[in-house]
């Protein structure tokens, strides 16, 4: 969610006429193409946000 939130904003600005469903498909594809090492910082950020939310 952390990654897609930022990427969705960028994609929406770059492609204002693109439908939300198409943006979601593109984001899903891009996420799958990332390596585990590329994904790791976003997993860490999500864990940090979860911990803050629990407090």
Swiss-Prot record:
What does the UniProt entry say about where the protein is found? Answer: Nucleus speckle; Cytoplasm; Nucleus
The UniProt entry, under SUPFAM superfamilies, shows: HMG-box
Pfam families per UniProt: HMG_box (PF00505)
Which Gene3D superfamilies does the record match to this protein?
High mobility group box domain
GO MF, one term, reads:
calmodulin binding
**Job of this protein:** Transcriptional regulator that controls a genetic switch in male development. It is necessary and sufficient for initiating male sex determination by directing the development of supporting cell precursors (pre-Sertoli cells) as Sertoli rather than granulosa cells. Involved in different aspects of gene regulation including promoter activation or repression. Binds to the DNA consensus sequence 5'-[AT]AACAA[AT]-3'. SRY HMG box recognizes DNA by partial intercalation in the minor groove and promotes DNA bending. Also involved in pre-mRNA splicing.
**Annotated protein name in UniProt:** Sex-determining region Y protein
Q: Which organism is it from?
A: Macaca fascicularis
Gene that produces this protein? SRY
